[in-house]
Amino acid sequence: MTDSQNFESHTPMMQQYLKLKAEHPEILLFYRMGDFYELFFDDAKKASRLLDISLTKRGQSAGQPIPMAGVPHHAVENYLAKLVQLGESVAICEQIGDPATSKGPVERKVIRIVTPGTVTDEALLEERQDNLLAAIWQDKNGAFGYATLDITSGRFRVTEMPDSESMAAELQRTHPAELLYPETFESMALIERQQGLRRRPIWEFECETAKQQLNLQFGTRDLTGFGVENARLALCAAGCLLQYVKDTQRTGLPHIRSITMERPQDTIILDAATRRNLELTQNLAGGCDNTLASVLDLCVTPMGSRMLKRWIHTPLRQREQLIKRQDAISALQPLYFELQPFLRQVGDLERVLARLALRSARPRDLSRMRHAFQQYQDIHQVLDQADMPYIKELQQRISQFDELRELLENAIVETPPVLVRDGGVIASGYNAELDEWRALADGASDYLEKLEVREREKWGIDTLKVGFNGVHGYYIQVSRGQSNLVPMHYVRRQTLKNAERYIIPELKEYEDKVLTSKGKALAIEKMLYEELFEKLLPHLTALQTSAEALAETDVLANLAERAESLNYTRPELTEKTGIQITGGRHPVVEQVLSEPFISNPLQLAPQRRLLIITGPNMGGKSTYMRQAALITLLAYIGSFVPAEKAVIGPIDRIFTRVGASDDLASGRSTFMVEMTETANILHNATENSLVLMDEIGRGTSTYDGLSLAWACAENLANRIKAMTLFATHYFELTTLPEKLEGTANIHLDAVEHGETIAFMHSVQEGAASKSYGLAVAALAGVPKEVIRRAKQKLKELETLSGHSGASHVETSQLMLLADIEPSEVELALNKIDPDSLTPKQALELLYHLKELNK
């Protein structure tokens, strides 16, 4: 900020501002001035652009006009929410001195820093989504350490990733609101599209310092008990993250009590492409509609909703834990209708407790906590009906907190105001001294009514009335027409258009007494409110345990309701390799369709591990494949599944190579994206992986594409032996079952009726007889003359190739076109390697070809 030059030439107020701004150079500074938060210089210009607020000037300082923008203090949360959504951080600077006693500028201090990853105010958060702060570290060998913290719950997780591909998947899974990275970070391409990037000095990632910080936070001598002692890369990231939180929160963090190491071998691994293609919590357009979560998540608490989404993104491999969840869902099926109304009243206890820990809880947070405690007895009574060990385990974690409930019932009014400074938070009868001061203040209304009647009758002024405002205090108001009747001892305080306002010694004396009593009452309220924190915080650990158990109860009750309402069945998790599904349905598509969904079977086993899927476009191949993956994933979060019966063996990873588009930002063509995803599968799949391969090789020439598809299928069947669904339009691949053990053909059925086609969406054994491409083109609205011409060419090609239905290679096409002299454009096209072109080169070439064709 160039305006900080010639510091002494600035006004005292601007000098104070510049000192505070120098301490927070990279973030916006909201500087409190009266009823506004003001921004100056570059901050003002940036805020004006981002918030669409007026940019003005505040006189001059150091000979230059000062750019200025401001927001009203009562609306600041709305503006903070917008800035946080845009990935910005803000330092909040408040007046802490008394203007009446200050010489020079009122003393000010930055009291909190709001960043996208550390917000706790409910107005700034999406209530049904986790809001994570993350830190990333990379060593010289290319391995990564990664840490995440949800400050609204205290959930602190670390992991280590061997390469960029797995790190990319983890970034997509966690989707952090803010990401800290070292200034020397080399893999910027991995994170450059992340919002809320914060570059940090290299020394903040020092491992030994991290261990000291973490031991200090947890009150431990070492980290062995957390299982992270030797995870050096993860600790580097965790240390930076914890230091950042301490710097921004400027208070204790008692709700961050432990750190957990997440190991890839404990969960089913889903790479970034799979998470995207399966549309788990976000659809391909970036929204939330028509996703698995949109169907599965009817949780009645926000904390339950967030937990369910974590389950969806982290399917477990521990069969025992999954069976516990299944048992709990079965036990809750007859009880969820009775249980959910009580759970709904618990609300977002998890985030309320985080604000309590950070001492930022507002009166309504304590009211919500009280209301949650009042539901506990009813929740326990319902759960008592479920005679099932895992439910009993959850009940034990949900302590009743009767003493805390009684404390809050006695201390907090039924409907408290938003802020403590508004007064009226502490209930009457809780503190005798507070009641006395309130009685004095509240007696004002009776006194004022009597004064008004007395003065009106005494002086014969029927328009006389007594009032109060925040600027002038108490006053006696008389209409302009009767102002000549007021006695001499009335002192004029304010003149209005149609009235005069006066003060008398008696009223002034009473005003001082009332304002003193109100001030005393408010001071006592604030003290009592702080004392409530001291009484609640010793129970924080038990409260957090209880909130987590309630969230899990909500998730399980929700899954019980979904199973009942959507006709899901309990899957059998077996130790034998394979997937056997009878009457399987796509959980999302069946909810979108207006007509009944056609259910289909799936059999995968060691002796039937690769299925070649053929059939028409729009026949349902992609839906069938995704359906298999989603049913498997649901089984491995412990949910019931959309099927008549499902028996599912061990799964270590789910891969999808389904659909593709150009990645222009990275300079990758559709075919390059397709091959990159295919390479990832061939390198990392195992015999326990579920692999979905859709239309491999379609982005290149027929020979190249067919060869690649054939080789990939062989590799998956012979070397990897993964459970694979392989959809293709290359009919040559339907001969693979004759050559490869463990391979079979299935197809999606369709029936032609004259010029039209009916898609049966039914899976049948064997290969499809035709691709029905022209019928689909006609349905899509391709002009009839084009369809007629296409049919003619199809007959010619089929005559030359000697068969119909199979894909036709370039030789037959060249035979048809051999008598045609190639044009300049064709000659130029033959020299082009499309996969080596950048988007810019392709555009330039297009203009060149257009010129040749003139």
Swiss-Prot record:
Name the record gives this protein: DNA mismatch repair protein MutS
Gene Ontology molecular function, alphabetical: ATP binding; ATP-dependent DNA damage sensor activity; damaged DNA binding; mismatched DNA binding
Matches recorded under NCBIfam families: mutS1, PRK05399.1
Task of the protein: This protein is involved in the repair of mismatches in DNA. It is possible that it carries out the mismatch recognition step. This protein has a weak ATPase activity.
CDD domains reported for this sequence: ABC_MutS1
Family from the record: Belongs to the DNA mismatch repair MutS family.
UniProt cross-references to HAMAP family, sorted A to Z: MutS
PANTHER family with a match to the protein in the record: DNA MISMATCH REPAIR PROTEIN MSH1, MITOCHONDRIAL, DNA MISMATCH REPAIR PROTEIN MUTS FAMILY MEMBER
Gene field: mutS
Residues holding ATP: 615-622
Keyword entries, A-Z: ATP-binding, DNA damage, DNA repair, DNA-binding, Nucleotide-binding
InterPro entries cross-referenced by the UniProt entry: DNA_mismatch_repair_MutS, DNA_mismatch_repair_MutS-lik_N, DNA_mismatch_repair_MutS/MSH, DNA_mismatch_repair_MutS_C, DNA_mismatch_repair_MutS_clamp, DNA_mismatch_repair_MutS_core, DNA_mismatch_repair_MutS_N, DNA_mismatch_repair_MutS_sf
UniProt GO BP: mismatch repair
GO cellular component: cytosol
One Pfam family it belongs to: MutS_I
